[in-house]
């Protein structure tokens, strides 16, 4: 009986080996996704990252011309770093055009890789900060300083232009003296009310003298390139600081409330 079972078992083993050679052992190990529990399927796409590990036990040195002998303990590893959790590196680019909140042409900027690869580089707004590109833009910068190329607005200048377009200036003037509005007074109010430093020579007022309260305008030229028209309201000055002007206001109020004025 035992002698008859031996040929049958050997034939089954040979048949199984032939089936594995034809179908491949990978089919046995392939996950049956269609039979898995709903919501716990296998992911067919792997996450492209690098995990750095090292052996827990050091492999002893082998003789010259021989391979080191590995034991089970040499297949035990410990985690050193998972690059998936590594901080995202930034990308250094050189802008070819002005970009809001980033910079102007020729600026060397450091942005997120997603911003650089999805926005700046595909649209031609920037190039890689290679040594050749750095040298090219340095030469262009020197030519602009020498006046051989047209000047461009700086990043601070563009921010100033954008801010002034949304502003309205209020200039307070007293009513106890004769006055005429001039660029020096307007420049002081720009700094006092809006926090913007404007040189008097960069301001342009209407040709007709401004001697009364009302609504006017003034043109501000930023770095000699861009001009912005800012609405301007000339109103009564209501915050006296000098004792003389406070005394004069008190006299005016007393005259209004006195019985003789009525």
Curated annotation (Swiss-Prot):
Q: Which UniProt keywords apply?
A: Mitochondrion, Ribonucleoprotein, Ribosomal protein, Transit peptide
Q: Does the keyword Transmembrane apply?
A: no
GO terms (molecular function) for this protein are:
structural constituent of ribosome
Q: Where in the cell is it found?
A: Mitochondrion
User: What positions does the transit peptide occupy in this chain?
Assistant: 1-49
Query: Which Pfam family, any one of them, does this sequence belong to?
Result: Ribosomal_L9_N
**InterPro entries to which the protein is assigned, alphabetical:** MRP-L9_N, Ribosomal_bL9, Ribosomal_bL9/RNase_H1_N, Ribosomal_bL9_N, Ribosomal_bL9_N_sf, Ribosomal_bL9m_C
Its Gene Ontology cellular component terms are: mitochondrial large ribosomal subunit; mitochondrion
Write out the GO biological process terms.
translation
Which family, according to the similarity comment? Belongs to the bacterial ribosomal protein bL9 family.
Q: How does it assemble?
A: Component of the mitochondrial ribosome large subunit (39S) which comprises a 16S rRNA and about 50 distinct proteins.
What is the protein name for this chain?
Large ribosomal subunit protein bL9m
Species name: Rattus norvegicus
Per UniProt, what is the name of the gene that codes for the protein in this document?
Mrpl9
């Amino acid at each position: 009986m035992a002698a008859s079972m031996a040929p049958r078992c050997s034939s089954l083993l040979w048949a199984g080996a032939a089936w594995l050679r034809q179908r491949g052992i990978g089919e046995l190990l392939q996950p049956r996704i269609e039979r898995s529990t709903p919501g716990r399927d296998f992911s067919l796409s792997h996450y492209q990252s690098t995990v750095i590990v090292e052996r827990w036990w050091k492999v002893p040195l082998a003789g010259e011309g021989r391979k080191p002998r590995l034991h089970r303990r040499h297949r035990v590893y410990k985690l050193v770093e998972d690059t998936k959790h590594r901080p995202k590196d930034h990308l250094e680019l050189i802008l070819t055009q002005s970009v809001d909140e980033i910079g102007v042409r020729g600026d060397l900027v450091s942005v997120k890789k997603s911003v650089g690869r999805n926005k700046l580089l595909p649209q031609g707004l920037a190039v890689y900060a290679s040594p050749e590109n750095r040298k090219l833009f340095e030469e262009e910068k020197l030519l602009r300083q020498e006046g051989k190329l047209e000047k461009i607005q700086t990043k601070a200048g563009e921010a100033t232009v954008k801010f002034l377009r949304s502003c309205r200036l209020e200039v307070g003037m007293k009513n106890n003296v004769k006055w005429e509005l001039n660029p020096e007074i307007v420049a002081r109010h720009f700094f006092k009310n809006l926090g913007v430093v404007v040189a008097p020579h960069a301001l342009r007022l209407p040709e007709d003298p401004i001697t009364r309260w009302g609504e006017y305008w003034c043109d501000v030229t930023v770095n000699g390139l861009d001009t912005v028209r800012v609405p301007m309201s000339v109103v009564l000055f209501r915050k006296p600081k000098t004792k003389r002007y406070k005394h004069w206001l008190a006299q005016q109020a007393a005259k209004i409330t006195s019985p003789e004025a009525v």
